[in-house]
């Protein structure tokens, strides 16, 4: 859907509308920074005007005092109930980056059934890095850490560390082994994105894992007119996420199925 690409670019621009930040190397800290955007977009990006829900969730479980993240969890539930993984397909800047890389003229790989089973890893990562490790560090040392942001999140390197290091030479020297590890992980993810469709979203992203739980229940998303459906499965054969059923947990509501449906039985909107 051509409209989807426009929406993706608009979201990326709106999330990072603090253009002076890219010139000055300063992180915006105004009142909008207390508002979470729905997609994955690093808080520390010099252009970011809102907060990342994953970062906000972890910050509540980090530091010397624990705070139950009522606001962030409530917001994620609202986003999930309304849109599910439609947010992944339409309003996530890091998803857009992966899709653009996939358009490069490289050999493409469809995941085998064995590899598709590993999509459950994003749920393991969500529990381990978003909850268990922050709490474990807190009870062991008296201070929690934002484990996913610190050890895994590639958006933090792409959108924050690299731009800030390019703008401010003074911060380059302190970058150490952890930066090198995350840079390597980013390179692996971006390289893999050229031949596997949205690998980070499928295997690693906690936000995708959380929204996927609401996919079948969300108000908006892919819907099928069963009176028009002829059961040809052309929709599934052309699904870039290799969904086993329309609207399942891996579906990002990109609309590729609707474009190839011979009877126009598939549409995107209120279910």
Give short role names for the model-derived ranges.
Residues 1-242, 249-250, 255-271:
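Non-ligating segments of multi-cofactor redox enzymes
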């Amino acid at each position: 859907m051509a409209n989807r690409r426009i929406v993706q670019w608009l979201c990326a621009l709106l999330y990072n509308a603090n253009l002076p930040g890219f010139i000055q190397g300063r992180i915006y800290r105004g009142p909008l920074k207390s508002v979470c955007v729905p997609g994955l977009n690093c808080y520390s990006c010099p252009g970011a005007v809102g907060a990342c829900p994953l970062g906000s969730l972890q910050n509540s479980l980090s530091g010397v005092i624990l705070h139950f993240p009522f606001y962030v969890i409530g917001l994620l539930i609202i986003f999930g109930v309304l849109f599910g993984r439609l947010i992944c397909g339409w309003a996530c800047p890091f998803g857009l980056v992966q899709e653009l890389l996939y358009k490069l003229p490289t050999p493409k790989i469809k995941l085998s059934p064995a590899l598709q089973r590993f999509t459950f890893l994003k749920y393991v990562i969500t529990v381990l890095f978003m909850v268990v490790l922050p709490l474990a560090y807190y009870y062991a040392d008296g201070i929690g850490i934002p484990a996913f942001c610190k050890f895994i999140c590639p958006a933090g390197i792409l959108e924050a560390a690299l731009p800030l290091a390019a703008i401010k030479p003074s911060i380059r020297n302190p970058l150490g082994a952890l930066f090198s590890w995350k840079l390597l992980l980013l390179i692996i993810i971006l390289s893999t994105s050229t031949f596997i469709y949205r690998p980070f979203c499928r295997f690693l992203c906690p936000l995708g894992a959380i929204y996927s739980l609401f996919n079948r229940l969300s108000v908006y998303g892919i819907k099928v007119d069963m009176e028009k459906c002829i059961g040809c499965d052309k929709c599934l054969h052309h699904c870039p996420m290799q969904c086993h059923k329309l609207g399942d947990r891996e579906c990002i509501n990109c609309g590729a199925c609707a474009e190839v449906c011979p009877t126009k039985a598939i549409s995107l909107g209120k279910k």
